[in-house]
């Protein structure tokens, strides 16, 4: 199949666009400039600061209208690029935060410029190394950490959270509670005796949730040195697949995949002569009628076959270990509402000030 090497800077990207569709070079340069303007408003003046007041967001509305932020990401990209596969490649950013490019506001096209501005980094040792470093930092400052405990509910007195109830029956009193739990789950399951404000109840009733994720982790007894750290494998269908995931909520015979090969950057992720991967497949969340106990292994086999036909030849014979997670695991392990991979979807009416407040 065709390939597109995204590159690490605009010059590399332009070179690839020129190879595939020379007529789209000028359009891409306009897209990049528009993405920068969206970044200056959508990130610098909106996302990078707290939303304590609706007026703060309201002040940016005229500029957002001038930038045509009412368009979807797909409409934004299609206005600049004509080649269908380039349109697909440059409209996938909303999927990085759980959104459908055909529904998500083009504000999120700022991600393209953001990646060039800040870069894309990987911590040696992976996310686990970041967690270990944070644990060490907190312990050095006298913070007591409790591992393997699950908070079942918050204890509220006079409108304030004053403690937490654990699943093992213990109670911990607190002067202040900071929670990074999935907000919809917290409001619906961890405040059993609290009547929520009307606005919060309305948000919950009308909330649209992000897609689910099927994540397959596997190791191989050989290396695939030609495979980069990040690879996206696009299926034959695009809009139809996304419609099945986000609206029809059914599994499609086609799949699009994100393949992560950390050993391309950090060889400690696998023994010598071996490789380590995970592959992420967008799927419907648990609002769908899907039995993941039955469908999980089928999808795993489909993904392995797809990778074997494309970027990892001979994969079926080289896998030495593997396991997968489904939206059901996200619900059970991470208390994510409907097993959504990214909580509520990044629609305009659920972004910035419209999100759940602190």
Regions found by a protein language model. Give the residues of each.
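A short, glycine/Asx- and small/polar-enriched loop/turn
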Residues: 2, 100-104, 155-162, 273-275
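Rossmann-like flavin
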Residues: 2-103
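A glycine-rich dinucleotide-binding beta-alpha-beta segment and adjacent secondary-structure elements
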Residues: 83-97, 254-258, 313-358
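Mid-domain catalytic core of redox enzymes
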Residues: 152-271
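C-terminal segments that line or cap access tunnels to active or ligand-binding sites in enzymes
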Residues: 221-330
């Amino acid at each position: 199949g065709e390939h597109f090497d995204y590159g690490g800077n605009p010059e590399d990207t332009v070179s690839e666009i020129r190879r595939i569709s020379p007529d789209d070079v000028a359009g891409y340069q306009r897209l990049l400039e528009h993405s920068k303007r969206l970044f200056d408003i959508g990130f610098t003046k909106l996302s990078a600061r707290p939303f304590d007041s609706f007026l703060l967001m309201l002040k940016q509305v005229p500029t957002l209208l001038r930038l045509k932020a009412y368009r979807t990401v797909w409409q934004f990209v299609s206005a600049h690029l004509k080649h269908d596969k380039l349109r697909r490649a440059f409209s996938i950013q909303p999927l990085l935060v759980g959104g459908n490019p055909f529904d998500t506001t083009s504000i999120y096209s700022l991600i393209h410029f953001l990646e060039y501005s800040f870069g894309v980094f990987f911590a040696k040792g992976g996310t686990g190394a970041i967690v270990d470093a944070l644990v060490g930092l907190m312990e050095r400052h006298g913070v007591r950490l409790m591992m393997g405990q699950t908070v079942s509910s918050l204890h509220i007195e006079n409108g304030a959270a004053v403690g937490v109830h654990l699943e093992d029956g213990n109670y911990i009193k607190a002067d202040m509670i900071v929670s990074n739990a999935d907000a919809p789950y917290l409001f619906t399951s961890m405040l059993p005796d609290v009547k929520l404000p009307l606005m919060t109840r309305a948000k919950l009733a009308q909330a649209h949730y992000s897609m689910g994720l099927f994540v397959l982790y596997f190791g191989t007894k050989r290396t695939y040195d030609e495979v980069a750290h990040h690879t996206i494998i696009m299926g034959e269908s695009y809009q139809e697949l996304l419609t099945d995931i986000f609206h029809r909520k059914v599994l499609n015979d086609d799949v699009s995949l994100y393949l992560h090969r950390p050993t391309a950057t950090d060889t400690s992720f696998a023994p010598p002569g071996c490789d380590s991967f995970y592959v992420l497949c967008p799927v419907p969340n648990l609002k769908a009628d899907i039995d993941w106990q039955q469908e999980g292994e089928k999808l795993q086999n489909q993904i392995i076959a797809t990778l074997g036909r494309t970027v990892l030849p001979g994969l079926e014979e080289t896998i030495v270990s593997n396991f997968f997670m489904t939206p059901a695991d996200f619900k059970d392990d991470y208390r994510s509402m409907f097993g959504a991979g990214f909580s509520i979807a990044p629609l305009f009416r659920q972004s910035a000030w419209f999100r759940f407040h602190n």
